[in-house]
Each structure stands twice: as C-alpha cells, then as structure tokens.
From Swiss-Prot:
HAMAP family: IspF. The gene is ispF. This is 2-C-methyl-D-erythritol 2,4-cyclodiphosphate synthase. It is an enzyme of class 4 (lyase). It catalyses: 4-CDP-2-C-methyl-D-erythritol 2-phosphate = 2-C-methyl-D-erythritol 2,4-cyclic diphosphate + CMP. Keywords: Isoprene biosynthesis, Lyase, Metal-binding. It comes from Shewanella frigidimarina (strain NCIMB 400).
Amino acid sequence: MNIRIGHGFDVHKFGGDSPLVLGGVTVPYDSGLIAHSDGDVVLHAISDAILGAMALGDIGKHFPDTDANFAGADSRVLLKHCYQLALQKQFVLGNLDVTIIAQAPKMAPHIEAIRQCLSADLQTDIDNINVKATTTENLGFTGRKEGIAVEAVVLMKSQ
C-alpha cells in the first residue's frame, strides 16, 4: 500500500455580513469571513491538504480568486472536487486531523456536526475524521478575534 501525507493551512479575516460557515456547518456568530468563495476556512485547509498529498498544487491553482466563476463558491463543492482528483489517482482518505485556531466563536458545540459533514463529503467513516479547536490565549490576530486559522493533515492511502 502506498500512503501520502498532506498538510493544509488557511486563514480568513472576519468581516461582512455573510454567515460564518466552518466545515460545511453554519456557526452562529456576529460576522462571517471575508473571502472570494464562501470563506469556509476549514474546507479550504482540508482541500489544500488533499491536493498537497496528491502533488496537485493548492486550491489557488485549481480555483483562482481572480476567476469570477468561483465568487461566492460553495466550498463543499470545491472540497468534493479535490477529493475526486485523489480518487482518480486511486487514493482514498485514511484519516483527517483538523485544528481550528480561533478565540471566538466557541467551537465545541459544533465539532460533531462538522465531523458528520466531513464524513459525508469525503465518503469515509466518521472515525477517520478528527476536528479540534484551540485558542491562542488572546495572542495574535486570532486572539484579538480578527479572524480564524485552520491547519489540516490528511493521510491518503492507495486503493
């Protein structure tokens, strides 16, 4: 069996009046995230991790923010496209580990819904999906509640 590891990282700034969507789940909060697409920073980091594991570049290459076709794009559609590229290379998700870095909103009430959404979108058992959240103890831009950062690591295995 061939295995590959991918790492993804993304950051978005709070702003605007669009809803806050994280991992495909709408999370109640004062503000959404500023982005060319729907701003789902969780799905962007995961998409980058999958593309990285497959040596296919990053989401900016596949969905450039200069392309009006992707304005307001549903990040679940983008994630599914990235996963399809892995499937075409005969790779499936072994496991996924996501860290959401945010002072606010509190993520604990939303973690299981995010895991369920990711499990469905990535066609894998929920036991292969881990999502956790941490703060930066009021330090840096996330600590000042200016935005959210996410790291994602995937293990992809050949079929």
